[in-house]
Amino acid sequence: MSEGNAAGEPSNPGGPRPLLSGGRGLIGRRPAPPLTPGRLPSIRSRDLTLGGVKKKTFTPNIISRKIKEEPKEEVTMKKEKRERDRDRQREGHGRGRGRPEVIQSHSIFEQGPAEMMKKKGNWDKTVDMSDMGPSHIINIKKEKRETDEETKQILRMLEKDDFIDDPGLKNDTRNMPVQLPLAHSGWLFKEESEEPEAKPFSAGPKEEDMEVDVPAVKVKEEPRDEEEEAKVKAPPRAARKTPGLPKDVSVAELLRELSLMKDEELLFLQLPDTLPGQPPTQDIKPVKTEVQGEDGQMVVIKQEKDREARLAENACTLADLTEGQVGKLLIRKSGKVQLLLGKVTLDVTMGTTCSFLQELVSVGLGDSRTGEMTVLGHVKHKLVCSPDFESLLDHKHR
């Protein structure tokens, strides 16, 4: 078999054909590699694209099959076992081994169903406590659910107002005002037996009785014990009693009682702000004030008081009255009490009783912020004086 040339033509039998020179090759083509004896040249030895874009080749997309991996349970079990062995070794060495760990929960249902309690014997052994005793039972209190009728009935009872809140509410004598000293308050009384003493039986004959000879009967007295004799001879003890509530007394009755009493008593008399009488004369002087004028000079201006201010200054008060007798108290047959202040009549009535202790105190002030206080006595009753408008209107019409 004969060798072929680069064009693939058979060689002449006469002799070897000379090779083409490099000058005759096409421009842009790479020269063919020299032939090696004993080997054919490659099919893609030359560039057939002529400098263009390479042709795309189709390659099919093969979808790879996914295999689901199963969880490896054996590996996890081995890891947990190793961790347990490691924890046991740690508990066995060092200080504080076997310390109890407390886990606190917020509610009794948070931990779930309770497990069987186990007691640790040694490091590696556990003892079941099921045979030791009964398990703990949690008693849960059942809540009672109210029906709609019960709730409506409760609301009706709350809305009712036809009952008495305090049925035993009475005036308590312990809330009475305390008066000092206690010796004068009259809280100590003597208890005397109200039972009438038994009169001695007289066996003598009466005029109405029939004349019959009755033999004299003598009663033998038995000796008494010392305790019984001491009880009979003992005087009545002074018992502590609370005084009763004060009686509602009119002004006329109060004045009669005070007139018959030997001891004097103080009364609180409330008078109006303005009293009938002549106010003291006052020198009314105009008030001078300096005002700066437009020219910058100071000008003195006299200012007089308003009419209301002058009327207020002309009013008569208790401090303006002279010492001595101020008026007269009149007690009518009907029980009405009036106070005459000049030509003005004032009605006198009882004031509201106070639940606290009142005392009249005289205060004397000194020059250097010092003074003296003197208690004059207790004030028990209060009288209120109000103007009689009917008499005032009648006097005005006249």
UniProtKB/Swiss-Prot annotation:
Any Gene Ontology biological process: positive regulation of interferon-beta production
Cross-link Glycyl lysine isopeptide (Lys-Gly) (interchain with G-Cter in SUMO2): where in chain: 68, 78, 141, 152, 160, 190, 199, 206, 220, 285, 302, 396
Keywords for the protein's UniProt record, in alphabetical order: Acetylation, Antiviral defense, DNA-directed RNA polymerase, Immunity, Innate immunity, Isopeptide bond, Methylation, Nucleus, Phosphoprotein, Transcription, Ubl conjugation
Modified sites of kind Omega-N-methylarginine: 95, 97, 99
PTM statement from Swiss-Prot or TrEMBL: Sumoylation on Lys-141 can serve as a signal to mark misfolded Pol III for proteasomal degradation.
InterPro entries on file: RPC4
Domain of life: Eukaryota
Residues with Phosphoserine modification: 42
GO cellular component: cytosol; nucleoplasm; nucleus; RNA polymerase III complex
Subunit relationships: Component of the RNA polymerase III complex consisting of 17 subunits: a ten-subunit horseshoe-shaped catalytic core composed of POLR3A/RPC1, POLR3B/RPC2, POLR1C/RPAC1, POLR1D/RPAC2, POLR3K/RPC10, POLR2E/RPABC1, POLR2F/RPABC2, POLR2H/RPABC3, POLR2K/RPABC4 and POLR2L/RPABC5; a mobile stalk composed of two subunits POLR3H/RPC8 and CRCP/RPC9, protruding from the core and functioning primarily in transcription initiation; and additional subunits homologous to general transcription factors of the RNA polymerase II machinery, POLR3C/RPC3-POLR3F/RPC6-POLR3G/RPC7 heterotrimer required for transcription initiation and POLR3D/RPC4-POLR3E/RPC5 heterodimer involved in both transcription initiation and termination.
Annotated family: Belongs to the eukaryotic RPC4/POLR3D RNA polymerase subunit family.
Protein task: DNA-dependent RNA polymerase catalyzes the transcription of DNA into RNA using the four ribonucleoside triphosphates as substrates. Specific peripheric component of RNA polymerase III (Pol III) which synthesizes small non-coding RNAs including 5S rRNA, snRNAs, tRNAs and miRNAs from at least 500 distinct genomic loci. Enables recruitment of Pol III at transcription initiation site and drives transcription initiation from both type 2 and type 3 DNA promoters. Required for efficient transcription termination and reinitiation.
Protein name: DNA-directed RNA polymerase III subunit RPC4
Organism encoding this protein: Mus musculus (Mouse)
